[in-house]
Structures are given as C-alpha cells and as structure tokens.
C-alpha cells in the first residue's frame, strides 16, 4: 500500500549512482553498520518503545522534535491523519519479546516515514533484527521508490528489492503517455541481482474508478510478463478485485512464485491459492476484529504457502491499529497467526523463513 509519486526520472547510471549514495547515507554497508558506535545503545526492552523510535531522545532545548537525520530525496511521509480524518497516535508501539526463530518481513516501505521521529533505515533494520525480523523485502510502487529499493538492497545485505508501478499509479502514467517508459525502466532495473520480485502490482478497484480499470489491467499484465521474463517472484496488490486478478493470472500464466501481498480474500480465494500454489502473505490486517474472512483463510492456507509482512508504515496490527508501523511489528502479527492456527510459534517462524527463502532466494546472510 503506497500512494503515487508524480515524478518520473530517466534511468541513467548517474541517477542510479546518486540514489545508491542516498541509500548508503541511510543504510550503511554491512562493515560500516557493524563498526558504528550507536548513541543510546539502541536498546530494545520488552514493553517499551525501542530507543530509535522514542521521540524523547530527540528533543531540543525548546522541546521540539529532532529528526535523526534529514529525510532528503527518496523518502516521503505518511499523513498524520487516519482514514476517519482524525489525528493519529504517532507514538511507535512497544517492543514484544523477540521471536524464537528469525523471520522475514516480506513487504515493507522504509522510504515512507511515519511517527514522531524519522527512523533511519539502518535503525529500522537493527531493531527488527533484535526482535526476530532478520531480513526484509523493500518494495517499490513507482520509479523513484523502486530505485530506492534497489539502492537499499545494494547497501545492506538484510534487504532484497521488489520493483513495480502501483496499480493506482498506472492510470495516471497511461494518461500522461509514460507508462511504457516506466515499464522499460523496470525491465532494466529487474536485471539487478538483488531485485527478487516484481511488485507491488495488481488491481485496486477501491481507490481507482472504472475509468482506470483498463490501464490497471494492462499494467498488471505487463508486470506479470516482466516477472516471467526475469524469473522473479510476483507481489500482488489485490483490493476488491479478486476475480479479475485470478483471471488475468491464469490467462497470462502466473510466475512460479506468486504472492498475494497483504492477503485480503476469503475462503474461495484461499482455496484457489492452495490449488494453484500461490502464496498468501498476511499483514497486520489478519489481527483486526473485523477480518474473519482473512482469519479463515489463514486457517485454510497450506503451510508451505504462508508468508508474513508489515506493509509498514501502514496496517499496524491490533491492538495498535492506526499507530506507526515498522518491521519489528511483524513479531506481533506472527504471534497472532500462530495462536490462530493453533501452531507453535517456533514452528510457524521456521516455516515462514523457509517459505520466504524459497520465494525470493538467499539474502546472502546467515540463516537467510
């Protein structure tokens, strides 16, 4: 889930290099990361907001908030208003107990900022790692965020990249006559070795009206073809469009590893996913009290097809719904999933990690 970004940038080596430099300023390379002496020790204490996420550590003498570093190019900020138009609680939730077995957050947006302080990607990765989220997939929704994903994956081995044009962005690009150019850019980026998925792509009939359906469907088909061409996984954004998503996947031929990001279907879609071998990735929405269909799908899902994600900074799990989200919060979602499936937490974590590596390949770090 992310909003469109209007600017399109020509894919040149100079621009890629500049974005890689940006990511290095946000996510240092592994050697720099391990050698750095971090202020406050970035302690993670159960029941307390992790130190990098605590605004009181970044107050100036006037009481104003101070960002850890300038946000700069490549980052955007989530609205401080909720869907109901009211101000949200911008305090990050407390840390849970670390997971018994490290897993993957297979869909997150580190470039989208939220909360009282700006969290560097390095600190987000460190906090997640301490709480059992050992690796992530950074997901693009347009050309700038896809370039950011590639640069972040180059800069830190805990990150792999997914690249795409979001379905809500596709109609605007089609109207501007630049959709094909954007797809050509993705085709070039897909050759990067740490790009492991095309996504998030798909169909969204909730935010885009009938006038945008044709462009969304054309874009979705082209993304499927890109994933197949490059042998990459496909991450699908599917909102109120289950029937057409399934139809187009079957018509085009779904990639071997097809993932329904932030799974939102019910029993019938779960049955189809089980039959086709498509993965179901569960976000914080599975914990919501009104998500009975998603919870039923979780119970139905074949174990080898289950993944977990945050879609951070969105979709924070219950009981912190509406507050800022980050990869460490996958921990809460997975605990709910284990309880709901009546499965041991350790077994579920091992299963999610194995499934994630099967879909995306190796991160090149121990255990992943």
Task: Annotate each predicted stretch with a short phrase.
Residues 1-368:
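Mid-domain alpha/beta scaffold segments of enzyme catalytic cores
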